[in-house]
């Protein structure tokens, strides 16, 4: 007798197993961290490897002001900051502490600021030589939901989400449901 196939057969995993990018430098980092993730028992390397697989949208840039805030945490001043993404400058920040920062890439302004304050800007492969198990490190991630597009996601009543509109003016999207004087306001 045949067997009922009640569950779906070839269920595709929603997780990436490699980066989508063809960047050879990224592929070298993946090769390095997949080796470290396999051969060491440290979860740090697994986290870095998974982060290297992410799309650019899910690897938002981290500003130096966010890093300086992270360094103010208790016991974080001597740690190496790890960013799987870009480190960007923030000219609103007046002083920046001396720190060692490992990242995929740095903008010119951010690198200048780090080096000017006596810090170090290193790459992730240099970090692997210094801390193969991620000892004395602190991973910092950027804000994923700060993109303009996220303002429109999950549209519905009382969500306070922005409608997708072609024109932004006094007469557009401002009638019933948007003003007390026009029936009601959500």
From Swiss-Prot:
Keyword vocabulary terms for this entry: Cytoplasm, Ribonucleoprotein, Ribosomal protein
Xref: PROSITE patterns: RIBOSOMAL_L18E
BP GO annotations: translation
GO molecular function, one term: RNA binding
GO CC entries: cytosolic large ribosomal subunit
Subcellular location: Cytoplasm
Stated role: Component of the ribosome, a large ribonucleoprotein complex responsible for the synthesis of proteins in the cell. The small ribosomal subunit (SSU) binds messenger RNAs (mRNAs) and translates the encoded message by selecting cognate aminoacyl-transfer RNA (tRNA) molecules. The large subunit (LSU) contains the ribosomal catalytic site termed the peptidyl transferase center (PTC), which catalyzes the formation of peptide bonds, thereby polymerizing the amino acids delivered by tRNAs into a polypeptide chain.
Complex and partners: Component of the large ribosomal subunit. Mature ribosomes consist of a small (40S) and a large (60S) subunit. The 40S subunit contains about 32 different proteins and 1 molecule of RNA (18S). The 60S subunit contains 45 different proteins and 3 molecules of RNA (25S, 5.8S and 5S).
Homology family: Belongs to the eukaryotic ribosomal protein eL18 family.
Record-given protein name: Large ribosomal subunit protein eL18
Organism of derivation: Candida albicans (strain SC5314 / ATCC MYA-2876) (Yeast)
Organismal lineage: Eukaryota, Fungi, Dikarya, Ascomycota, Saccharomycotina
